[in-house]
């Protein structure tokens, strides 16, 4: 696990909507991180690489001032046959997004991946309302991370339990659990248990916010 290498990218997006999983209610809040499920799915679609795994986090300065970038979109879904509007939904989204994304590859060295010019800077779409222009993201290569340090702190992303070792999570001290969607085919999937942001863990420094008072 200590020999893993990661490709770090800077991600920017003018408008992004990654909503919380809420069963009921008319208000759908957005998440405050870049979950494993969202970014991994988008990158696999872009590169057609099932051996690619990724997660992300918002830039610390962006996260500190995130309230000024929150906005709400009013969406009125319609019944297909009756053409009658359902109860309007309030969908929260973010503007001027700045984040970091970390890619882990199995079966290919990061160095060979970024040798290709098209892999150093590219666009993807991610999240909800892509057909309305949401979710266009630009990624720029920053560096390859080798031998990251192990720190104890609060997790800054969301990752399924069965992929924790890919991103250096050695110990879960105080978990915050939730569920992320995992596709099982092009038309179906399932929800699997995941560690959410705020979990107290021992893991790689780029994924944790260190505790001041341990």
Where are these regions (language model features)?
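Conserved active-site/ligand-binding neighborhood in enzyme cores
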Residues: 1-214
């Amino acid at each position: 696990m200590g020999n893993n290498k990661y490709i770090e990218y800077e991600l920017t997006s003018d408008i992004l909507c990654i909503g919380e999983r809420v069963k009921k209610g008319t208000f759908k809040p957005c998440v405050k991180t870049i979950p494993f499920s969202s970014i991994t799915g988008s990158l696999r679609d872009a590169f057609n690489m099932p051996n690619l795994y990724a997660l992300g986090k918002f830039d610390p300065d962006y996260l500190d001032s995130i309230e000024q970038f929150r906005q709400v979109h009013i969406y009125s879904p319609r019944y297909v046959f009756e053409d009658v509007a359902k109860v309007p939904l309030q969908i929260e989204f973010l503007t001027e997004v700045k984040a970091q994304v970390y890619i882990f590859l199995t079966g290919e060295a990061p160095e060979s991946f970024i040798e290709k010019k098209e892999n150093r800077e590219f666009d993807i779409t991610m999240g909800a309302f892509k057909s309305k222009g949401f979710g266009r993201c630009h990624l720029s290569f920053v560096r390859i991370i080798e031998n990251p340090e192990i720190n104890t702190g609060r997790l800054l992303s969301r990752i399924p339990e069965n992929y924790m070792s890919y991103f250096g999570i050695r110990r879960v001290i105080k978990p915050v659990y939730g569920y992320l969607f995992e596709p099982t085919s092009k038309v179906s999937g399932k929800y699997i248990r995941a560690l959410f942001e705020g979990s107290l863990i021992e893991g790689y420094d780029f994924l944790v916010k260190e505790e001041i008072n341990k």
